[in-house]
UniProtKB/Swiss-Prot annotation:
It comes from Malus sp. (Crab apple). Coiled coil: none annotated. GO terms for biological process: photorespiration; reductive pentose-phosphate cycle. GO terms for molecular function: ribulose-bisphosphate carboxylase activity. InterPro entries: RuBisCO_ssu, RuBisCO_ssu_dom, RuBisCO_ssu_N, RuBisCO_ssu_sf. Residues 1-59 form a transit peptide. This is Ribulose bisphosphate carboxylase small subunit, chloroplastic. The gene is RBCS. RuBisCO catalyzes two reactions: the carboxylation of D-ribulose 1,5-bisphosphate, the primary event in carbon dioxide fixation, as well as the oxidative fragmentation of the pentose substrate. Both reactions occur simultaneously and in competition at the same active site. Although the small subunit is not catalytic it is essential for maximal activity. Its main location: plastid. Heterohexadecamer of 8 large and 8 small subunits.
Amino acid sequence: MASSMISSGTVATVSADRPAPAQARMVAPFTGLKSSSASPVTRKSNDITSIASNGGRVQCMQVWPPLGLKKFETLSYLPPLSTESLAKEVDYLLRKNWVPCLEFELEHGFVYRENHRSPGYYDGRYWTMWKLPMFGCTDSSQVLKELEEAKKAYPQSFIRIIGFDNVRQVQCISFIAYKPAGF
């Protein structure tokens, strides 16, 4: 108890005469992460206006309109991809050594829960596979050729391209490559 009452000047003179043990140096008690003996700190209010730190950019954010615009797969917020953009996406999945695969859906190409009701990534849709996965595919033009065949066979369907990792046995990428007219 007496050691906690020593002033810092007394400790300095004791230290000059002989080395002080580590326990002789007292530190002020801490409250949370800040010292209670530190200089006065200004406290910020935690109201809703102090949370956003991006200032004026908050006003330019937009909300996806839920009426009239369906949410599709990855990249669905972009305009329809051109043939060149699709080729670049397919080249990307080929560089990652993923197996390209095409799937199509005749009725619901958008997020729709039919067979599974819980929230999360899995939305209960089952798409039909177009032919077989393209094992050994090395060129995006092969995938785009199959995409054109699928469009001719099912012009009113949604068609997506999937990148499948056959080592980890997971689907790594999936995006809509074709939407029927009116979507």
